[in-house]
Amino acid sequence: MPKMKSVKGAVKRFKVKKNGTVKRGTAFRSHILTKQDPQTRTTQHKSKIIAKVDEKNVKAMIN
């Protein structure tokens, strides 16, 4: 049986941390940021952690 291919879009978007949780980037960061509150802009710099419900599916797509 052939190997499962990883979903390349998921590989580019998600990273698995050492403790097993999955990191993702924040949405709404590409352009037209002048309308956003400065506090919102600074909090969006940080990466977010995926919910436990979605973790299994994302890890399957990556591996």
UniProtKB/Swiss-Prot annotation:
Annotated keywords: Ribonucleoprotein, Ribosomal protein
Cellular component (GO) terms are: cytosolic large ribosomal subunit
Biological process terms from the Gene Ontology for this record are: translation
The family database entries (Gene3D superfamilies) matched by this protein are listed as: 4.10.410.60
Signal sequence range: none
Q: Which GO terms describe its molecular function?
A: structural constituent of ribosome
Q: Give coiled-coil spans as residue ranges.
A: none
- Spans through the membrane: none
NCBIfam families from the UniProt entry: rpmI_bact
Family recorded in the similarity comment: Belongs to the bacterial ribosomal protein bL35 family.
HAMAP family named in the record = Ribosomal_bL35
Descriptive protein name: Large ribosomal subunit protein bL35
